[in-house]
Design a protein with these regions (language model features):
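Acidic/aromatic-lined carbohydrate-recognition and catalytic surfaces
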Residues: 1-175
Length: 175
């Protein structure tokens, strides 16, 4: 585990553990989460680790008066992620500092609760592009000083999601 992650984790460990145990009362699950967090940090690229470090040094970065965001439906604004990337000059002209894209993740079609019935939290909806398209867009936004925001709302899980299917099938772990 990198020294920077270890130091940051140590600052927040007590709060994380308290919240997790209040919600789940599952010490083993907490240990799994902590290992997964360390593994995820190790897997982050150098560019994101540098951004983490800069933001940790300036914890109020997101409270500045120059923060200006835009929320949009990707499909309605640009059709897909590749077309959205072509709007970068417009975003820069607007002095955008963060962009919140809704909904973006794989969903069942046509019954998807306006895009909020998520079928796969790890995959961009094919109608909007690919995970690689999202990575490319994110990198270009970051170069322009724009942070990407996405929603991960677990109660927006589609009935066709593997978790829901396992629950319906009677899997006790998912129930």
């Amino acid at each position: 585990m990198a020294q920077e992650f270890s130091a940051r984790f140590a600052r927040h460990k007590d709060e994380l553990e308290w919240l997790f145990m209040e919600l789940y009362n599952n010490r083993e699950g907490l240990e799994v989460l902590e290992r997964e967090m360390a593994d995820a940090y190790d897997a982050r690229n150098a560019e994101l680790k540098a951004l983490d470090k800069a933001r940790a040094a300036d914890p109020n970065w997101y409270k500045r008066g120059n923060m200006f965001g835009m929320t949009m439906y990707t499909d309605l604004f640009a059709g897909n992620l590749k077309e959205l990337a072509k709007k970068l000059p417009y975003f820069k002209e607007q002095k955008l500092t963060y962009l919140h894209l809704m909904p973006l993740l794989q969903m069942p079609h046509p019954h998807n609760d306006g895009g909020y019935a998520v079928e796969d939290f790890d995959t961009v909806d094919p109608a909007l592009g690919t995970n690689k398209d999202l990575e490319n867009l994110t990198r270009e936004l970051r170069k322009a000083g724009i942070s990407l925001c996405l929603d991960f709302v677990m109660n927006h899980t589609a009935s066709t999601h593997r978790w829901a299917m396992a629950t319906k099938a009677g899997d006790p772990w998912f129930q």
